[in-house]
Protein backbone atom coordinates (compact mmCIF):
# COMPACT_ATOMS: atom_id res chain seq x y z
CA UNK A 1 0.00 0.00 0.00
CA UNK A 2 2.81 2.41 0.86
CA UNK A 3 4.40 1.79 -2.53
CA UNK A 4 1.14 2.77 -4.19
CA UNK A 5 0.96 6.04 -2.22
CA UNK A 6 4.61 6.78 -2.94
CA UNK A 7 4.17 6.14 -6.67
CA UNK A 8 1.22 8.53 -6.92
CA UNK A 9 2.96 11.19 -4.83
CA UNK A 10 6.03 11.01 -7.07
CA UNK A 11 3.78 11.17 -10.12
CA UNK A 12 2.18 14.42 -8.91
CA UNK A 13 5.58 15.88 -8.05
CA UNK A 14 6.93 14.95 -11.47
CA UNK A 15 4.01 16.53 -13.24
CA UNK A 16 4.34 19.59 -11.01
CA UNK A 17 7.79 20.28 -12.17
CA UNK A 18 7.43 19.23 -15.65
CA UNK A 19 -27.76 29.07 -20.76
CA UNK A 20 -28.79 32.65 -21.19
CA UNK A 21 -29.92 34.13 -24.52
CA UNK A 22 -28.61 37.68 -24.89
CA UNK A 23 -30.68 38.38 -27.99
CA UNK A 24 -33.93 38.10 -26.11
CA UNK A 25 -32.82 40.61 -23.49
CA UNK A 26 -30.53 42.73 -25.70
CA UNK A 27 -27.87 43.30 -23.02
CA UNK A 28 -26.31 46.74 -23.27
CA UNK A 29 -22.70 46.26 -22.21
CA UNK A 30 -21.01 49.14 -20.43
CA UNK A 31 -17.74 50.61 -21.67
CA UNK A 32 -14.78 49.39 -19.67
CA UNK A 33 -14.45 52.78 -17.95
CA UNK A 34 -17.99 52.53 -16.58
CA UNK A 35 -17.97 48.81 -15.84
CA UNK A 36 -14.80 49.24 -13.75
CA UNK A 37 -14.52 52.81 -12.47
CA UNK A 38 -10.98 53.28 -11.21
CA UNK A 39 -9.66 55.83 -8.74
CA UNK A 40 -6.30 56.37 -7.05
CA UNK A 41 -5.63 58.60 -4.06
CA UNK A 42 -2.68 59.55 -1.89
CA UNK A 43 -3.59 59.14 1.81
CA UNK A 44 -2.30 61.18 4.75
CA UNK A 45 -0.37 58.11 5.91
CA UNK A 46 1.69 58.24 2.72
CA UNK A 47 0.01 55.13 1.28
CA UNK A 48 -1.58 55.16 -2.17
CA UNK A 49 -5.10 53.79 -2.27
CA UNK A 50 -6.40 52.11 -5.42
CA UNK A 51 -10.12 51.50 -5.77
CA UNK A 52 -12.30 49.88 -8.42
CA UNK A 53 -16.05 50.48 -8.33
CA UNK A 54 -17.41 47.44 -10.19
CA UNK A 55 -20.85 47.60 -11.78
CA UNK A 56 -23.45 44.94 -11.00
CA UNK A 57 -23.11 41.95 -13.30
CA UNK A 58 -19.39 42.50 -13.89
CA UNK A 59 -16.27 41.12 -12.24
CA UNK A 60 -12.49 41.62 -12.20
CA UNK A 61 -9.98 38.77 -12.40
CA UNK A 62 -7.52 38.64 -9.51
CA UNK A 63 -4.76 37.08 -11.60
CA UNK A 64 -5.03 39.85 -14.23
CA UNK A 65 -4.05 42.62 -11.83
CA UNK A 66 -0.64 44.04 -12.82
CA UNK A 67 1.56 46.73 -11.29
CA UNK A 68 4.19 47.56 -13.91
CA UNK A 69 6.95 49.81 -12.65
CA UNK A 70 6.44 48.82 -9.01
CA UNK A 71 9.02 46.50 -7.37
CA UNK A 72 7.59 43.11 -6.42
CA UNK A 73 8.19 43.69 -2.72
CA UNK A 74 5.95 46.79 -2.88
CA UNK A 75 3.03 45.12 -4.65
CA UNK A 76 -0.17 45.46 -2.60
CA UNK A 77 -1.51 42.37 -0.86
CA UNK A 78 -4.48 41.00 -2.78
CA UNK A 79 -7.52 40.05 -0.66
CA UNK A 80 -9.41 36.85 -1.16
CA UNK A 81 -12.01 37.13 -3.86
CA UNK A 82 -15.06 35.17 -4.86
CA UNK A 83 -14.50 31.81 -6.52
CA UNK A 84 -15.74 31.82 -10.11
CA UNK A 85 -15.82 28.52 -11.99
CA UNK A 86 -15.98 27.93 -15.69
CA UNK A 87 -15.52 24.92 -17.92
CA UNK A 88 -12.31 26.04 -19.60
CA UNK A 89 -10.22 27.97 -17.06
CA UNK A 90 -11.36 26.17 -13.90
CA UNK A 91 -11.74 28.06 -10.64
CA UNK A 92 -10.65 31.69 -10.70
CA UNK A 93 -10.63 34.32 -7.97
CA UNK A 94 -12.69 37.36 -9.01
CA UNK A 95 -13.85 40.59 -7.39
CA UNK A 96 -17.38 41.97 -7.60
CA UNK A 97 -18.92 45.30 -6.54
CA UNK A 98 -15.66 46.83 -5.35
CA UNK A 99 -11.95 46.27 -4.77
CA UNK A 100 -9.67 48.35 -2.58
CA UNK A 101 -5.87 48.00 -2.49
CA UNK A 102 -3.15 50.00 -0.78
CA UNK A 103 0.43 50.58 -1.90
CA UNK A 104 2.75 51.12 1.06
CA UNK A 105 4.22 54.52 1.81
CA UNK A 106 7.63 55.11 0.28
CA UNK A 107 6.80 54.02 -3.27
CA UNK A 108 7.45 56.83 -5.74
CA UNK A 109 7.16 57.62 -9.44
CA UNK A 110 4.55 56.56 -11.95
CA UNK A 111 3.30 53.01 -12.36
CA UNK A 112 0.92 51.31 -14.78
CA UNK A 113 -1.94 49.47 -13.10
CA UNK A 114 -3.36 46.78 -15.36
CA UNK A 115 -6.67 44.99 -14.88
CA UNK A 116 -9.15 42.92 -16.83
CA UNK A 117 -12.71 41.80 -16.26
CA UNK A 118 -15.80 40.29 -17.82
CA UNK A 119 -19.57 40.59 -17.76
CA UNK A 120 -21.79 37.79 -16.50
CA UNK A 121 -23.81 38.09 -19.71
CA UNK A 122 -20.83 36.78 -21.68
CA UNK A 123 -18.46 39.59 -22.68
CA UNK A 124 -14.77 39.80 -21.77
CA UNK A 125 -12.97 43.13 -21.93
CA UNK A 126 -9.40 43.44 -23.21
CA UNK A 127 -6.67 44.19 -20.65
CA UNK A 128 -6.91 47.81 -19.52
CA UNK A 129 -4.16 50.04 -18.11
CA UNK A 130 -4.27 53.18 -15.99
CA UNK A 131 -1.29 55.35 -15.08
CA UNK A 132 -1.00 56.18 -11.37
CA UNK A 133 1.29 58.85 -9.96
CA UNK A 134 2.51 57.67 -6.56
CA UNK A 135 3.58 61.19 -5.71
CA UNK A 136 0.02 62.05 -4.78
CA UNK A 137 -1.55 63.41 -7.96
CA UNK A 138 -5.09 62.09 -8.27
CA UNK A 139 -5.58 61.26 -11.95
CA UNK A 140 -8.87 59.39 -11.85
CA UNK A 141 -11.88 60.12 -9.71
CA UNK A 142 -15.26 58.59 -9.14
CA UNK A 143 -18.14 59.32 -6.80
CA UNK A 144 -17.85 56.64 -4.14
CA UNK A 145 -21.00 57.50 -2.21
CA UNK A 146 -20.44 54.88 0.47
CA UNK A 147 -21.54 55.19 4.06
CA UNK A 148 -20.57 51.74 5.32
CA UNK A 149 -18.07 49.00 4.58
CA UNK A 150 -17.12 48.80 0.92
CA UNK A 151 -18.47 45.85 -1.10
CA UNK A 152 -14.96 44.44 -1.21
CA UNK A 153 -14.77 44.59 2.58
CA UNK A 154 -18.13 42.82 2.92
CA UNK A 155 -16.92 40.10 0.57
CA UNK A 156 -13.76 39.63 2.64
CA UNK A 157 -15.87 39.41 5.82
CA UNK A 158 -18.00 36.62 4.33
CA UNK A 159 -14.92 34.71 3.17
CA UNK A 160 -13.33 35.14 6.61
CA UNK A 161 -16.39 33.70 8.33
CA UNK A 162 -16.20 30.51 6.29
CA UNK A 163 -12.45 30.25 6.83
CA UNK A 164 -12.90 30.53 10.60
CA UNK A 165 -15.41 27.66 10.57
CA UNK A 166 -13.21 25.47 8.37
CA UNK A 167 -10.08 26.00 10.46
CA UNK A 168 -11.98 25.50 13.71
CA UNK A 169 -13.15 22.15 12.34
CA UNK A 170 -9.62 21.35 11.21
CA UNK A 171 -8.36 21.99 14.74
CA UNK A 172 -11.06 19.76 16.18
CA UNK A 173 -9.97 16.93 13.88
CA UNK A 174 -6.30 17.43 14.77
CA UNK A 175 -7.19 17.00 18.45
CA UNK A 176 -8.20 13.40 17.69
CA UNK A 177 -4.96 12.31 15.99
CA UNK A 178 -2.84 9.53 17.60
CA UNK A 179 -0.37 12.08 18.98
CA UNK A 180 -3.02 14.19 20.71
CA UNK A 181 -6.03 12.25 22.02
CA UNK A 182 -4.17 9.70 24.23
CA UNK A 183 -2.24 12.56 25.87
CA UNK A 184 -5.32 14.53 26.94
CA UNK A 185 -5.73 12.95 30.43
CA UNK A 186 -2.02 13.46 31.18
CA UNK A 187 -2.17 17.01 29.87
CA UNK A 188 -5.25 17.76 31.97
CA UNK A 189 -3.43 16.60 35.09
CA UNK A 190 -0.42 18.81 34.34
CA UNK A 191 -2.57 21.88 33.79
CA UNK A 192 -5.16 21.56 36.51
CA UNK A 193 -3.24 19.70 39.20
CA UNK A 194 -5.13 17.82 41.92
CA UNK A 195 -8.24 18.86 43.84
CA UNK A 196 -9.43 21.55 41.44
CA UNK A 197 -13.17 22.12 41.06
CA UNK A 198 -14.73 21.86 37.58
CA UNK A 199 -15.07 25.65 37.49
CA UNK A 200 -11.41 26.14 38.41
CA UNK A 201 -10.39 23.43 35.96
CA UNK A 202 -12.28 25.15 33.16
CA UNK A 203 -10.55 28.47 33.91
CA UNK A 204 -7.10 26.84 33.89
CA UNK A 205 -7.82 24.89 30.70
CA UNK A 206 -9.12 28.06 29.05
CA UNK A 207 -5.87 29.85 29.94
CA UNK A 208 -3.94 26.97 28.37
CA UNK A 209 -6.05 26.82 25.20
CA UNK A 210 -6.15 30.59 24.60
CA UNK A 211 -2.38 30.88 25.06
CA UNK A 212 -1.81 28.03 22.62
CA UNK A 213 -4.23 29.61 20.12
CA UNK A 214 -2.45 32.97 20.42
CA UNK A 215 0.86 31.31 19.52
CA UNK A 216 -0.79 29.80 16.44
CA UNK A 217 -2.27 33.21 15.61
CA UNK A 218 1.20 34.77 15.80
CA UNK A 219 2.46 32.11 13.40
CA UNK A 220 -0.40 32.96 11.03
CA UNK A 221 0.37 36.69 11.12
CA UNK A 222 4.06 36.04 10.48
CA UNK A 223 3.33 33.66 7.59
CA UNK A 224 0.98 36.20 5.98
CA UNK A 225 3.51 39.01 6.33
CA UNK A 226 6.28 36.92 4.80
CA UNK A 227 4.01 35.86 1.95
CA UNK A 228 2.33 39.23 1.31
CA UNK A 229 3.95 39.55 -2.12
CA UNK A 230 3.54 35.90 -3.06
CA UNK A 231 0.38 36.35 -5.14
CA UNK A 232 2.23 38.13 -7.93
CA UNK A 233 4.59 35.16 -8.24
CA UNK A 234 1.96 32.43 -8.09
CA UNK A 235 1.23 32.72 -11.81
CA UNK A 236 4.65 31.10 -12.43
CA UNK A 237 4.17 27.39 -13.29
CA UNK A 238 7.47 26.48 -11.63
CA UNK A 239 6.45 28.13 -8.37
CA UNK A 240 3.03 26.49 -8.47
CA UNK A 241 4.75 23.17 -9.07
CA UNK A 242 7.09 23.76 -6.13
CA UNK A 243 4.19 24.49 -3.79
CA UNK A 244 2.37 21.38 -5.02
CA UNK A 245 5.51 19.33 -4.35
CA UNK A 246 5.62 20.69 -0.79
CA UNK A 247 2.04 19.53 -0.20
CA UNK A 248 2.97 16.10 -1.54
CA UNK A 249 5.89 16.04 0.90
CA UNK A 250 3.53 16.99 3.74
CA UNK A 251 1.20 14.14 2.76
CA UNK A 252 3.85 11.42 3.09
CA UNK A 253 4.13 11.56 6.93
CA UNK A 254 0.36 11.11 7.13
CA UNK A 255 0.79 7.71 5.45
CA UNK A 256 3.65 6.68 7.74
CA UNK A 257 6.60 7.08 5.37
CA UNK A 258 8.49 9.20 7.89
CA UNK A 259 7.87 11.56 10.82
CA UNK A 260 8.01 15.29 10.26
CA UNK A 261 8.71 17.20 13.47
CA UNK A 262 10.84 19.89 15.06
CA UNK A 263 14.63 19.39 15.25
CA UNK A 264 15.62 17.36 18.32
CA UNK A 265 17.64 20.19 19.89
CA UNK A 266 14.74 22.64 19.68
CA UNK A 267 12.22 20.07 20.90
CA UNK A 268 14.34 19.05 23.91
CA UNK A 269 14.86 22.66 24.93
CA UNK A 270 11.14 23.41 24.83
CA UNK A 271 10.33 20.22 26.74
CA UNK A 272 12.77 21.17 29.51
CA UNK A 273 11.13 24.58 29.86
CA UNK A 274 7.70 22.93 29.88
CA UNK A 275 8.66 20.47 32.65
CA UNK A 276 9.78 23.36 34.86
CA UNK A 277 6.33 24.95 34.71
CA UNK A 278 3.90 24.12 37.48
CA UNK A 279 0.24 23.51 36.88
CA UNK A 280 -2.61 24.77 39.05
CA UNK A 281 -2.18 28.49 38.30
CA UNK A 282 -3.54 30.59 35.46
CA UNK A 283 -0.06 31.87 34.63
CA UNK A 284 1.46 28.39 34.65
CA UNK A 285 -1.35 27.03 32.47
CA UNK A 286 -0.87 29.93 30.06
CA UNK A 287 2.88 29.29 29.78
CA UNK A 288 2.25 25.58 29.19
CA UNK A 289 -0.24 26.48 26.44
CA UNK A 290 2.21 28.82 24.72
CA UNK A 291 4.96 26.20 24.86
CA UNK A 292 2.64 23.51 23.49
CA UNK A 293 1.94 25.77 20.52
CA UNK A 294 5.67 25.79 19.79
CA UNK A 295 6.27 22.16 20.72
CA UNK A 296 4.54 20.68 17.67
CA UNK A 297 4.25 16.90 17.61
CA UNK A 298 4.75 14.70 14.55
CA UNK A 299 1.02 14.42 13.86
CA UNK A 300 0.61 18.20 13.96
CA UNK A 301 3.66 19.34 12.00
CA UNK A 302 2.44 18.55 8.50
CA UNK A 303 -1.10 19.98 8.91
CA UNK A 304 0.28 23.12 10.58
CA UNK A 305 2.85 23.57 7.82
CA UNK A 306 0.11 23.19 5.22
CA UNK A 307 -2.04 25.78 6.99
CA UNK A 308 0.88 28.23 7.16
CA UNK A 309 1.56 27.69 3.46
CA UNK A 310 -2.08 28.45 2.66
CA UNK A 311 -1.95 31.62 4.76
CA UNK A 312 1.32 32.74 3.16
CA UNK A 313 -0.42 32.72 -0.22
CA UNK A 314 -3.24 34.95 1.04
CA UNK A 315 -0.87 37.67 2.27
CA UNK A 316 -3.53 38.89 4.73
CA UNK A 317 -2.04 39.19 8.23
CA UNK A 318 -5.35 39.74 10.06
CA UNK A 319 -7.00 36.88 8.21
CA UNK A 320 -4.04 34.58 8.86
CA UNK A 321 -3.96 35.36 12.56
CA UNK A 322 -7.69 34.88 13.08
CA UNK A 323 -8.03 31.57 11.26
CA UNK A 324 -5.06 30.00 13.05
CA UNK A 325 -6.47 31.29 16.34
CA UNK A 326 -9.72 29.49 15.43
CA UNK A 327 -7.73 26.33 14.68
CA UNK A 328 -6.05 26.56 18.08
CA UNK A 329 -9.42 26.90 19.81
CA UNK A 330 -10.65 23.85 17.89
CA UNK A 331 -7.66 21.84 19.09
CA UNK A 332 -8.42 22.85 22.67
CA UNK A 333 -12.15 22.01 22.74
CA UNK A 334 -11.66 18.33 23.75
CA UNK A 335 -9.40 19.44 26.62
CA UNK A 336 -12.06 21.87 27.86
CA UNK A 337 -14.62 19.05 27.78
CA UNK A 338 -12.31 16.71 29.66
CA UNK A 339 -11.60 19.05 32.59
CA UNK A 340 -15.24 20.08 33.03
CA UNK A 341 -17.42 17.01 32.33
CA UNK A 342 -14.88 14.18 32.26
CA UNK A 343 -14.06 11.79 29.46
CA UNK A 344 -17.53 10.35 28.92
CA UNK A 345 -18.11 12.62 25.91
CA UNK A 346 -14.72 11.93 24.30
CA UNK A 347 -14.16 9.05 21.87
CA UNK A 348 -11.88 6.23 22.96
CA UNK A 349 -8.45 5.94 21.29
CA UNK A 350 -8.25 3.30 18.60
CA UNK A 351 -7.39 2.46 15.01
CA UNK A 352 -9.72 5.19 13.80
CA UNK A 353 -7.09 7.81 14.74
CA UNK A 354 -4.66 6.44 12.15
CA UNK A 355 -7.52 6.57 9.67
CA UNK A 356 -7.86 10.27 10.45
CA UNK A 357 -4.19 10.79 9.61
CA UNK A 358 -4.79 9.13 6.26
CA UNK A 359 -7.67 11.50 5.55
CA UNK A 360 -5.33 14.44 6.09
CA UNK A 361 -2.85 12.83 3.72
CA UNK A 362 -5.43 12.58 0.95
CA UNK A 363 -6.47 16.19 1.59
CA UNK A 364 -2.86 17.29 1.08
CA UNK A 365 -2.60 15.36 -2.20
CA UNK A 366 -5.90 16.85 -3.37
CA UNK A 367 -4.58 20.33 -2.53
CA UNK A 368 -1.48 19.64 -4.60
CA UNK A 369 -3.67 18.69 -7.56
CA UNK A 370 -5.80 21.82 -7.18
CA UNK A 371 -2.69 24.00 -7.23
CA UNK A 372 -1.51 22.30 -10.43
CA UNK A 373 -4.78 22.69 -12.31
CA UNK A 374 -3.97 26.07 -13.93
CA UNK A 375 -0.75 24.72 -15.50
CA UNK A 376 -1.87 21.22 -16.55
CA UNK A 377 -3.81 20.05 -19.55
CA UNK A 378 -7.37 19.54 -18.31
CA UNK A 379 -7.61 15.89 -19.40
CA UNK A 380 -4.28 15.09 -17.69
CA UNK A 381 -5.50 16.81 -14.52
CA UNK A 382 -8.74 14.81 -14.59
CA UNK A 383 -6.72 11.61 -15.05
CA UNK A 384 -4.63 12.42 -11.98
CA UNK A 385 -7.81 13.09 -9.99
CA UNK A 386 -9.10 9.69 -11.09
CA UNK A 387 -5.87 8.05 -9.97
CA UNK A 388 -6.11 9.69 -6.54
CA UNK A 389 -9.72 8.51 -6.14
CA UNK A 390 -8.77 4.95 -7.09
CA UNK A 391 -6.00 4.92 -4.47
CA UNK A 392 -8.47 6.32 -1.92
CA UNK A 393 -10.93 3.56 -2.87
CA UNK A 394 -8.29 0.87 -2.34
CA UNK A 395 -7.34 2.43 0.99
CA UNK A 396 -10.97 2.49 2.17
CA UNK A 397 -11.37 -1.17 1.18
CA UNK A 398 -8.25 -2.17 3.14
CA UNK A 399 -9.38 -0.18 6.19
CA UNK A 400 -12.72 -1.99 6.24
CA UNK A 401 -10.97 -5.16 7.44
CA UNK A 402 -10.33 -3.71 10.90
CA UNK A 403 -13.58 -1.93 11.73
CA UNK A 404 -16.04 -4.75 12.28
CA UNK A 405 -19.63 -3.51 12.31
CA UNK A 406 -18.92 -0.34 10.34
CA UNK A 407 -17.01 -2.20 7.65
CA UNK A 408 -19.95 -1.78 5.27
CA UNK A 409 -19.46 2.01 5.41
CA UNK A 410 -15.90 1.62 4.16
CA UNK A 411 -17.08 -0.86 1.56
CA UNK A 412 -19.67 1.56 0.19
CA UNK A 413 -17.15 4.41 0.22
CA UNK A 414 -14.63 2.24 -1.59
CA UNK A 415 -17.20 1.36 -4.24
CA UNK A 416 -18.26 4.97 -4.84
CA UNK A 417 -14.70 6.29 -4.98
CA UNK A 418 -13.63 3.44 -7.24
CA UNK A 419 -16.47 3.97 -9.71
CA UNK A 420 -15.93 7.72 -9.90
CA UNK A 421 -12.16 7.32 -10.20
CA UNK A 422 -12.59 4.77 -12.99
CA UNK A 423 -14.99 7.06 -14.87
CA UNK A 424 -12.50 9.92 -14.60
CA UNK A 425 -9.67 7.76 -15.92
CA UNK A 426 -11.80 6.55 -18.84
CA UNK A 427 -12.91 10.10 -19.63
CA UNK A 428 -9.35 11.43 -19.42
CA UNK A 429 -8.21 8.78 -21.90
CA UNK A 430 -10.73 10.18 -24.37
CA UNK A 431 -9.70 13.80 -23.77
CA UNK A 432 -12.48 14.75 -21.36
CA UNK A 433 -12.29 18.19 -19.77
CA UNK A 434 -15.33 17.90 -17.48
CA UNK A 435 -14.75 16.64 -13.93
CA UNK A 436 -18.45 16.05 -13.24
CA UNK A 437 -19.32 14.56 -16.67
CA UNK A 438 -16.19 12.65 -17.67
CA UNK A 439 -17.92 10.38 -20.19
CA UNK A 440 -19.64 13.19 -22.06
CA UNK A 441 -16.74 13.21 -24.50
CA UNK A 442 -17.96 9.83 -25.77
CA UNK A 443 -21.59 10.87 -26.27
CA UNK A 444 -23.04 10.87 -29.74
CA UNK A 445 -23.67 14.61 -29.78
CA UNK A 446 -20.14 15.47 -28.80
CA UNK A 447 -18.69 12.90 -31.15
CA UNK A 448 -20.46 14.39 -34.12
CA UNK A 449 -19.24 17.87 -33.35
CA UNK A 450 -15.75 16.75 -32.41
CA UNK A 451 -15.44 14.84 -35.65
CA UNK A 452 -15.85 18.06 -37.61
CA UNK A 453 -12.42 19.73 -37.84
CA UNK A 454 -13.67 22.60 -39.99
CA UNK A 455 -14.45 24.73 -36.89
CA UNK A 456 -10.75 25.52 -36.57
CA UNK A 457 -9.51 25.26 -40.15
CA UNK A 458 -12.33 27.25 -41.73
CA UNK A 459 -11.37 30.42 -39.84
CA UNK A 460 -8.52 32.63 -40.99
CA UNK A 461 -6.80 34.12 -37.95
CA UNK A 462 -6.12 37.86 -38.22
CA UNK A 463 -3.84 39.79 -35.85
CA UNK A 464 -2.91 42.71 -38.08
CA UNK A 465 -5.25 45.52 -39.27
CA UNK A 466 -3.63 45.54 -42.70
CA UNK A 467 -4.32 41.81 -43.12
CA UNK A 468 -7.95 42.41 -42.16
CA UNK A 469 -8.30 45.09 -44.81
CA UNK A 470 -6.86 42.80 -47.48
CA UNK A 471 -9.33 40.04 -46.59
CA UNK A 472 -12.27 42.48 -46.64
CA UNK A 473 -11.24 43.92 -50.01
CA UNK A 474 -10.90 40.45 -51.48
CA UNK A 475 -14.28 39.33 -50.12
CA UNK A 476 -16.01 42.43 -51.50
CA UNK A 477 -14.42 41.89 -54.90
CA UNK A 478 -15.81 38.35 -54.91
CA UNK A 479 -19.24 39.39 -53.60
CA UNK A 480 -18.81 37.26 -50.47
CA UNK A 481 -20.25 37.70 -46.99
CA UNK A 482 -17.77 37.96 -44.09
CA UNK A 483 -18.14 36.92 -40.46
CA UNK A 484 -15.75 38.70 -38.09
CA UNK A 485 -15.23 36.72 -34.89
CA UNK A 486 -13.44 38.73 -32.19
CA UNK A 487 -11.54 36.20 -30.08
CA UNK A 488 -8.94 36.09 -27.27
CA UNK A 489 -7.25 33.25 -25.41
CA UNK A 490 -8.26 34.78 -22.07
CA UNK A 491 -11.94 35.01 -23.08
CA UNK A 492 -13.98 32.27 -21.39
CA UNK A 493 -17.08 32.88 -23.50
CA UNK A 494 -14.97 32.63 -26.66
CA UNK A 495 -13.93 29.12 -25.62
CA UNK A 496 -17.54 28.19 -24.96
CA UNK A 497 -18.69 29.43 -28.37
CA UNK A 498 -15.76 27.79 -30.13
CA UNK A 499 -16.94 24.46 -28.76
CA UNK A 500 -20.71 24.83 -28.59
CA UNK A 501 -21.33 26.96 -31.69
CA UNK A 502 -18.50 26.66 -34.19
CA UNK A 503 -17.86 23.08 -33.09
CA UNK A 504 -21.25 22.01 -34.47
CA UNK A 505 -21.32 20.49 -37.94
CA UNK A 506 -24.68 22.01 -38.89
CA UNK A 507 -23.50 25.50 -37.93
CA UNK A 508 -20.40 25.26 -40.10
CA UNK A 509 -22.47 23.87 -42.95
CA UNK A 510 -24.71 26.95 -42.80
CA UNK A 511 -21.60 29.14 -43.04
CA UNK A 512 -20.06 27.26 -45.94
CA UNK A 513 -20.32 30.27 -48.31
CA UNK A 514 -19.17 32.84 -45.74
CA UNK A 515 -15.58 34.06 -45.35
CA UNK A 516 -14.73 33.39 -41.71
CA UNK A 517 -12.18 35.72 -40.11
CA UNK A 518 -11.11 35.29 -36.50
CA UNK A 519 -9.69 38.54 -35.13
CA UNK A 520 -7.28 37.52 -32.37
CA UNK A 521 -7.01 40.33 -29.80
CA UNK A 522 -5.29 38.26 -27.12
CA UNK A 523 -2.24 40.51 -26.99
CA UNK A 524 -2.50 43.88 -25.27
CA UNK A 525 -0.85 45.89 -28.04
CA UNK A 526 -1.56 48.60 -30.60
CA UNK A 527 -2.68 46.12 -33.28
CA UNK A 528 -5.33 44.59 -31.00
CA UNK A 529 -6.58 48.02 -29.95
CA UNK A 530 -6.85 49.09 -33.59
CA UNK A 531 -8.80 45.94 -34.48
CA UNK A 532 -11.22 46.58 -31.62
CA UNK A 533 -11.47 50.28 -32.39
CA UNK A 534 -12.23 49.88 -36.09
CA UNK A 535 -15.79 48.76 -35.39
CA UNK A 536 -15.94 50.10 -31.81
CA UNK A 537 -16.11 46.61 -30.32
CA UNK A 538 -16.00 46.56 -26.48
CA UNK A 539 -14.35 43.15 -26.34
CA UNK A 540 -14.67 39.49 -27.28
CA UNK A 541 -16.72 37.57 -28.05
CA UNK A 542 -18.28 39.83 -30.66
CA UNK A 543 -19.57 38.66 -34.05
CA UNK A 544 -20.02 41.09 -36.94
CA UNK A 545 -21.61 40.46 -40.33
CA UNK A 546 -20.06 42.28 -43.30
CA UNK A 547 -22.24 42.12 -46.40
CA UNK A 548 -21.08 41.50 -49.95
CA UNK A 549 -21.11 45.29 -50.39
CA UNK A 550 -18.48 45.69 -47.64
CA UNK A 551 -20.90 47.30 -45.14
CA UNK A 552 -21.49 45.94 -41.64
CA UNK A 553 -25.04 44.94 -40.74
CA UNK A 554 -24.79 46.75 -37.41
CA UNK A 555 -28.30 45.90 -36.22
CA UNK A 556 -27.48 42.19 -36.41
CA UNK A 557 -24.21 42.40 -34.45
CA UNK A 558 -23.76 39.79 -31.72
CA UNK A 559 -22.04 40.88 -28.51
CA UNK A 560 -21.50 38.32 -25.79
CA UNK A 561 -22.07 34.59 -25.57
CA UNK A 562 -24.89 32.87 -27.48
CA UNK A 563 -25.83 29.27 -28.25
CA UNK A 564 -25.85 27.59 -31.65
CA UNK A 565 -29.60 27.98 -32.19
CA UNK A 566 -29.56 31.71 -31.49
CA UNK A 567 -26.52 32.21 -33.71
CA UNK A 568 -28.13 30.44 -36.67
CA UNK A 569 -31.38 32.35 -36.19
CA UNK A 570 -29.49 35.64 -36.30
CA UNK A 571 -27.54 34.59 -39.41
CA UNK A 572 -30.74 33.54 -41.19
CA UNK A 573 -32.37 36.88 -40.36
CA UNK A 574 -29.32 38.80 -41.56
CA UNK A 575 -29.02 36.87 -44.81
CA UNK A 576 -32.73 36.97 -45.70
CA UNK A 577 -32.99 40.70 -44.96
CA UNK A 578 -30.32 41.52 -47.50
Curated annotation (Swiss-Prot):
Q: Per its UniProt record, what Gene3D superfamilies does this chain match? A: Glutaredoxin, Thiol:disulfide interchange protein DsbD, N-terminal domain
Question: What are the Thioredoxin domain coordinates in residue numbering?
Answer: 433-576
> Where primarily located?
membrane
HAMAP family membership: DbsD
Keywords linked to the UniProt accession: Cell inner membrane, Cell membrane, Cytochrome c-type biogenesis, Disulfide bond, Electron transport, Membrane, NAD, Oxidoreductase, Redox-active center, Signal, Transmembrane, Transmembrane helix, Transport
How this chain sits in the membrane, per its record, is: Multi-pass membrane protein
- Periplasmic compartment: which residues? 19-158, 229-237, 303-321, 373, 430-578
Q: Where in the cell is it found?
A: Cell inner membrane
Q: Which residues lie on this side of the membrane: Cytoplasmic?
A: 180-207, 259-281, 343-351, 395-408
Query: GO molecular function, one example?
Result: protein-disulfide reductase [NAD(P)H] activity
Catalytic activity annotation:
[protein]-dithiol + NAD(+) = [protein]-disulfide + NADH + H(+); [protein]-dithiol + NADP(+) = [protein]-disulfide + NADPH + H(+)
User: Top enzyme class of this protein?
Assistant: oxidoreductase
Q: Could you list the residue ranges forming a coiled coil in this record?
A: none
Which pairs are disulfide-linked? 118-124, 179-299, 491-494
Q: Would the keyword Transport be found if you checked this record's keyword annotation?
A: yes
Q: Which family does it belong to?
A: Belongs to the thioredoxin family. DsbD subfamily.
Q: Name one GO biological process term.
A: cell redox homeostasis
EC number annotated for this UniProt entry = 1.8.1.8
Q: Where is the signal peptide?
A: 1-18
Its annotated function is as follows: Required to facilitate the formation of correct disulfide bonds in some periplasmic proteins and for the assembly of the periplasmic c-type cytochromes. Acts by transferring electrons from cytoplasmic thioredoxin to the periplasm. This transfer involves a cascade of disulfide bond formation and reduction steps.
Q: Output this protein's name.
A: Thiol:disulfide interchange protein DsbD
Q: Which chain regions cross the lipid bilayer?
A: 159-179, 208-228, 238-258, 282-302, 322-342, 352-372, 374-394, 409-429
Q: Name one GO cellular component term.
A: plasma membrane
Amino acid sequence: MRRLFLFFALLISGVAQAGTNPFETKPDFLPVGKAFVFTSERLESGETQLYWQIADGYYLYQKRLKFDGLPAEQHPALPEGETHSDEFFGEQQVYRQGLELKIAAGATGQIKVGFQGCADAGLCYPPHTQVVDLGGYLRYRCDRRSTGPSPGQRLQQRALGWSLLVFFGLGLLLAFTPCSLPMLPILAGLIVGSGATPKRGFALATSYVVSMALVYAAMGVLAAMLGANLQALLQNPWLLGSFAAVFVLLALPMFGFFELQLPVAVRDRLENVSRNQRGGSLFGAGVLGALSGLLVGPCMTAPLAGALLYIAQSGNALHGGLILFAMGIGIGVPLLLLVTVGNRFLPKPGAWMNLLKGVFGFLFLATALLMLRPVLDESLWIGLCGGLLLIAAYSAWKQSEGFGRVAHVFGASSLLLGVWGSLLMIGAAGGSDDLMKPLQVYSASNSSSAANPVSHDAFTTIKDPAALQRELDEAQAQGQWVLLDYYADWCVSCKVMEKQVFGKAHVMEALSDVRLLRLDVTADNAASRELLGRYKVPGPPSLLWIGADGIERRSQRITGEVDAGTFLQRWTTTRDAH
